[in-house]
Design a protein with these regions (language model features):
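Flexible, non-catalytic linker and terminal segments flanking ANL/adenylate-forming cores
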Residues: 1-43
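Conserved pre-ATP/AMP-binding loop-to-beta segment of ANL
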Residues: 184, 194-208
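AMP-dependent adenylate-forming
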Residues: 25-30, 47-70
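Structured binding elements
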Residues: 118
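Conserved ATP-dependent adenylate/AMP-binding module captured primarily in the ANL superfamily
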Residues: 128-158
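Conserved helix-loop-beta element of the AMP-binding
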Residues: 141-143, 160-174
């Protein structure tokens, strides 16, 4: 069938946007033996994408209730956490860090710190029960799980069972709950006011 006027408009717009020399120019590459069509000018990694936000340092990035964080403030926490994950827990390319919390600002900070190390984020359903959390953590085998107070309450009863299979470190966010061995508090290890000036070096391939 003939394209509608609206469809023709979208097609011509896309052709203009993806034309040679444009920001959204397309190119053909082979990824692990599979031919793919990709954006020629896309950032090569999520770390590179995050680093592009440095130009917006003083702008608000996250607003949570009465809390506001600029890009620069978030970036400082990201650098601090990334160095801690690498230095204290050996997190690097190919490793996994799990996140189990409501939509706190720390969720986003953990995401960027993790991918900036070349590690994978394991996003866990915040509604999961203790048994579901145990299954997910045993299946994903992360080095670290970062949890808020509600998720920590569900995790603690099954933590010993999980650790029978996974050498798991637990980091709590916005929680005063007593912690067992091999646990830490975000507030004790993430220091945005004294963060390193740069992210840790990381060897990340675009296809990781």
């Amino acid at each position: 069938s003939m394209p509608t006027a609206l469809m023709q408009h979208y097609l011509s717009t896309w052709e203009e946007m993806a034309a040679d020399g444009s920001q959204f120019e397309m190119t053909d590459i082979t990824v692990r033996g599979v031919p793919m069509r990709v954006f020629k000018n896309a950032p090569p990694t999520m770390r590179a994408f995050w680093e592009l936000t440095a130009g917006y340092a003083d702008r608000d990035y996250i607003v949570y209730e009465d809390e506001r964080f600029t890009y620069a403030e978030v970036a400082a926490s990201v650098r601090s956490l990334a160095h801690h994950l690498r230095d204290a827990h050996g997190v690097g390319s190919g490793d996994r860090v799990a996140i189990s919390m409501r939509n706190f600002p720390e969720w986003v900070m953990t995401y960027w710190a993790t991918v900036s190390l070349g590690a994978a984020v394991v996003g866990m359903n915040a509604w999961w029960t203790s048994e579901e959390m145990k299954f997910g953590l045993n299946d994903a085998q992360p080095k670290v799980v970062i949890v808020d107070d509600e998720r920590l309450e569900r995790l603690l009863p099954v933590l010993d069972e999980i650790r029978a299979d996974v050498a798991l470190h637990v980091m709590s966010v916005r929680s005063d709950r007593d912690l067992s061995d091999n646990c830490s508090r975000w507030s004790d290890v993430v220091d945005a006011s004294n963060a390193p000036a740069e992210l840790p070096p990381a060897d990340i391939d675009p296809d990781d």
